[in-house]
Design a protein with these regions (language model features):
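Gly/Pro-rich cap/lid or specificity-loop segments adjacent to the active site
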Residues: 1-245
Length: 245
């Protein structure tokens, strides 16, 4: 969303307000004088309810996904929960309308995908903000948002990478964690997210094999690729597709 369309959308949701919150660039060295801003949206829907459960932060995953619209969106999509929770959407550091991480590079049409990716990575490494765009720094941001809102604890809804983020929060701030809903969970027992990326090709291939191909086969009148899933797969591989081993 652009800022104008986003603000217009939020203004149409009763009880929603946006704010910029200033936090240290480095929570491990907050006295160094460097700060960044976080854009936060609060949708207050539980005020006056004697069964109010507090706030619930929301993160859609990524990493790199904008969470700002998700607080207001959850209030609309889950009205029963909204009676008990005020949903908090926020753009994590480096993302969206928070202090953004900008990696400026010029694509080279002669580069293959790996060379182009390396150029992007090198450009990001030149940005002095990059070392501070981490999960650990972000969970400190989340706890600061909780504290600014005057809440003793926070609940949380996270999807995909957002489950990794939520698990980190619980590990660092267990005393402030209330109810956490982790959907499409990342394996927090691993040393890092790389194992997730390693597994994704096989996961995507299984979805293609078990869901997409049978669907195409059932609708041959639309796609015209035949009614046998394995034959359709073979045709796909013949024109350049690859099978994940």
């Amino acid at each position: 969303f652009g800022s104008e369309s986003l603000n217009a959308r939020f203004n149409a949701i009763p009880g929603t307000a946006c704010a910029d919150v200033t936090v240290p660039r480095d929570w491990k060295n907050p006295e160094d004088g460097h700060t960044i801003t976080l854009r936060v949206a609060k949708t207050e829907t539980s005020k006056g309810n004697p069964e109010r459960q507090g706030i619930a932060l929301v993160n859609p995953g990524g990493p790199g996904g904008s969470g700002l619209p998700w607080g207001p969106a959850m209030a609309e999509r889950a009205p029963e929960l909204a009676e008990q929770y005020d949903f908090i959407g926020f753009d994590p550091r480096g993302v969206g309308q928070s202090t953004a991480l900008e990696c400026t590079y010029t694509p080279n049409p002669e580069h293959d995908v790996w060379q182009d990716t390396k150029a992007q990575v090198d450009a990001c490494l030149e940005n002095e903000l990059t070392p501070y765009i981490t999960t650990e720094q972000t969970v400190y941001d989340m706890d600061f948002i909780r504290a600014v809102l005057g809440e003793e604890k926070t609940s949380y809804i996270g999807y995909s990478y957002g489950t990794w983020l939520g698990s980190w929060y619980q590990r660092v701030f267990p005393q402030h964690a209330h109810r956490f809903l982790l959907d499409s969970a990342v394996d927090i027992s691993r040393d890092g997210l790389q194992t997730t990326w390693d597994l994704q090709p096989r996961s995507r291939d299984r979805q293609f094999q078990d869901a997409m191909l049978p669907y195409v086969a059932r609708h041959d009148e639309i796609f015209g690729l035949g009614d046998d899933p394995m034959q359709i797969r073979q045709r796909w591989e013949d024109v350049g597709g690859t099978r994940t081993q």
